[in-house]
């Protein structure tokens, strides 16, 4: 079977949540990959299947995927943890039956650990033409597991990159901090709320103010409501969900983005990309792939994973505001690595190479 044919038509299988105003990382990346492929291949040459709620209609989903495979020179899937166990075998079957290439664009940085004790799933994924991961760390871990089809493609975002003259400078205390992500326990929300309040208490003044943006997950809402009820709104405030595509304008003017994640499966977090594109540095926990994204002292300040006392120490550093204000230009420069334009160049190369991981 010919495997190096030119790629003209592409099918994308993922959680698009069509018709819904959703801004979580999975949906945003899935939609962005579709748009990148449309711009590279032409709108008429890219079709998709939305997997939202597929468990209720598995037969209908299978039929749609078969029709998509008949149309496509390459199928690109973007499932999360549970979905990969279903869609990886499906794409292997469709690849064999219809001759289309199979590509897995991974969301986040969890895949290597997830499949370490799943040899059957790993075998399926090794037969893919390409697996696109967000970091060199994940690529290295997969290479150690015997994969030879892994490429690095960042989590690109379609955002306006601010120019230097557009950057708004915070004027002083209380220094404004922002959280900009889905709101649930593993994002470290409790840690940053505690750290801001504790820092202000120890300093004896309102040195920091925290604004929280994002969709509160249902399982965390009751806890979050209690957490917010115990805060003074002038110190910690929930600002709701920011309009899609307006993250840079919302973040412009903040001193720093707080990213206190407790999730080891982070890859290239979209919220950090948002911050860089707005010229905003980050205070981040050291998730496993952090060093590929956060340059210590250049684009952010990091602290020990899971250690909220270390987060507090960061805030109590009297030089922190001065250090962060000096990072704005490097952050803008770093943001270009994750821009839509950078993504176009990468996906154009991937398509022209036939998603051949061995010719990169």
Which residues does each predicted region cover?
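A charged, aromatic-enriched C-terminal amphipathic alpha-helix characteristic of glycosyltransferases
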Residues: 322-353
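Donor nucleotide-sugar binding/catalytic pocket of nucleotide-sugar-dependent glycosyltransferases
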Residues: 127-164
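Short hydrophobic beta-strand element within catalytic cores of glycosyltransferases
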Residues: 258, 277, 281-284, 294
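Glycosyltransferase donor-sugar binding loop
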Residues: 50, 209-223
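Conserved donor-binding/catalytic core segment of Leloir-type glycosyltransferases
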Residues: 8-13, 168-187, 192-198, 210-211
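Nucleotide-activated donor-binding/catalytic signature segment of Leloir-type glycosyltransferases, i.e.
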Residues: 222-243
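Conserved acidic donor-binding segment of nucleotide-sugar-dependent glycosyltransferases
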Residues: 296-297, 301-308, 315-322
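Acidic donor-binding loop of glycosyltransferase active sites
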Residues: 252-266, 280
């Amino acid at each position: 079977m010919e495997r190096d044919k030119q790629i003209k038509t592409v099918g994308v299988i993922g959680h698009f949540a069509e018709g819904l105003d959703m801004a979580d990382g999975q949906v945003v990346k899935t939609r962005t990959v579709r748009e990148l492929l449309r711009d590279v291949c032409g709108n008429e040459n890219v079709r998709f299947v939305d997997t939202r709620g597929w468990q209720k209609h598995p037969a209908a989903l299978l039929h749609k995927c078969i029709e998509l495979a008949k149309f496509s020179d390459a199928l690109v899937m973007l499932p999360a943890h549970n979905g990969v166990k279903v869609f990886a075998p499906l794409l292997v079957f469709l690849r064999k039956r219809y001759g289309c290439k199979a590509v897995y664009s991974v969301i986040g940085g969890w895949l290597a650990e997830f499949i370490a004790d799943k040899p059957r799933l790993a075998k399926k994924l090794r037969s893919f033409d390409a697996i696109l991961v967000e970091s060199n760390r994940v690529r290295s871990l997969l290479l150690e597991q015997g994969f030879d089809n892994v490429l690095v493609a960042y989590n690109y975002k379609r955002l306006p990159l601010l120019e230097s003259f557009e950057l708004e400078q915070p004027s002083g205390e209380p220094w404004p901090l922002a959280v900009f992500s889905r709101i649930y326990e593993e994002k470290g929300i409790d840690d940053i709320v505690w750290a801001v309040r504790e820092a202000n208490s120890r300093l004896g003044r309102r040195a920091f103010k925290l604004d929280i943006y994002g969709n509160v997950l249902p399982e965390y809402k009751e806890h979050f409501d209690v957490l917010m009820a115990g805060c003074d709104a002038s110190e910690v405030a929930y600002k709701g969900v920011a309009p899609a595509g307006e993250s840079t304008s919302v973040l412009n003017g903040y001193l720093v983005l707080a990213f206190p994640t407790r999730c080891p499966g982070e890859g290239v977090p979209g919220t950090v990309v948002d911050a860089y594109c707005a010229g905003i540095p980050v205070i981040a926990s050291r998730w496993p792939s952090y060093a590929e994204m956060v340059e210590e002292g250049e684009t952010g300040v990091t602290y020990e994973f899971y250690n909220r006392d270390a987060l507090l120490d960061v805030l109590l550093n009297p030089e922190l505001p001065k250090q962060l204000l000096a990072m704005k230009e490097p952050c803008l420069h770093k943001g270009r690595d994750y821009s839509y334009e950078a993504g176009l160049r990468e996906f154009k190369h991937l398509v022209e190479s036939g998603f051949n991981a061995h010719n990169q």
